[in-house]
Amino acid sequence: MLAQFKHRPLATILFAASAAFAWATGAAAQSGEPIKIGYSMAMTGGLGGNGKSALLAQKIWEEETNAKGGLLGRPVKLIYYDDKSTPSEVPAIYTKLLDVDKVDLVIGAYATAMLAPAMPIVMSKNKVFIGLLGLAVNSEFNYPNYFVMIPSGPVPKPAFTKGFFNIAMAQNPKPTTVAIVAADQEFSRNASDGARENAKAAGLQIVYDKSYPPSTTDFGPIVRAIQATNADLVVVCSYPPDSIGMVRAVNEIGYKPKMIGGAMVGLQATAIKTQLGALLSGWVNYDFWLPVPKMQFPGVADLMAKYQARAPGEGVDALGYYMA
């Protein structure tokens, strides 16, 4: 889905942050005190599965960096708190990291919905901020010290579903109509904005374009409403709990559009793929990294081996392709 962009291991975000710190402080900063890197991370709640997977990769980076002597002759220390997959928890966490823990660097929480509420806090301190898989978070803030690790390029909103539409428009006969459904939260709004752009660029008629509350658990009525439009394509912009709910509802109702999927977070996880099994047959969704020859960047195989060896004991995603 995002094949035109390269994806590097998650540990790269920590390397980039530490490199920025080294550049800013110079050799005079060397001492025995640890370089503290702070952030919030979803360890529970709907994003907890992905968040814990990311955390394991970050711990591996911390251990390896310290084993090699740290940075600037100083050890590194990760300081993180569970944001419970709840945006309202995030501002207090970043305030504590900066004002109480006195961290040297802040990096992003996992996911768009958690990054956005951190931005005003980080901006008020004029800190460099490197986000983790946030879609178009900076489009409203325009903060010059914000960077993000997500392979969606300089125009992120349409890039996220560009691959979906490219595949759809290669069909013969070409589709003519599309339905867009999204959770009413930051990521899904941004992804659906991009889907709208792609649909218009492709000359598709948008026959359904609605959002649903993030607390939704019954997706049957939504699927039936989309089915009634007879849309050729269905773009779903969702986080893990609703991605699962949408897949189950589509299969239970027996709805079969020409193509469905697009921007569904969660379907990349090994446990969710195993849980849904054959119900995922026919869905077209994005991923960031898979173990194919062209994506075997230096260091990836070593990181994957270490991650996968520790994953069972940590109770995280067995493969780690999406978050590690």
PLM regions: where:
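Short, low-complexity disordered leader/linker segments with a strong preference
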Residues: M1-K36
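Beta-alpha junction/loop-to-helix N-cap segments that form part of ligand/metal-binding clefts
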Residues: P34-K36, G49-L56, K68-F141, M149, ...
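Extracytoplasmic ligand/sensor domains, especially the bilobed periplasmic-binding protein
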Residues: V103-Y208, K258-N285
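Signal peptide-proximal N-terminal region
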Residues: Q30-G32, L56-L78, M169-P173, K200-G203
